[in-house]
């Protein structure tokens, strides 16, 4: 929940995908090799554009040249689970990028308190 919330607050029109990837919440080292393929994706059948992967050390594993734009609909996603563990948590919220930030479109709260 914390990483979805943290990553969502970074996004605004004009932010590049590379800037987002550099500032995004970092997965714990013992979970990194088990991460979901992307941190951000568009809406569709399966991880549509924009597709922002968890970056490798030199950012060679994806195209980070895009820019967040007003009226873009995105999903902020996370999976955290240790490698070889039986359990983990996969969370996702959908947002509309607006002039002054994001409007949450998903209605289910991820807060367990």
Tell me the role of every PLM-derived stretch.
Residues 1-113:
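Active-site neighborhoods and metal-handling regions in enzymes and metal-associated proteins
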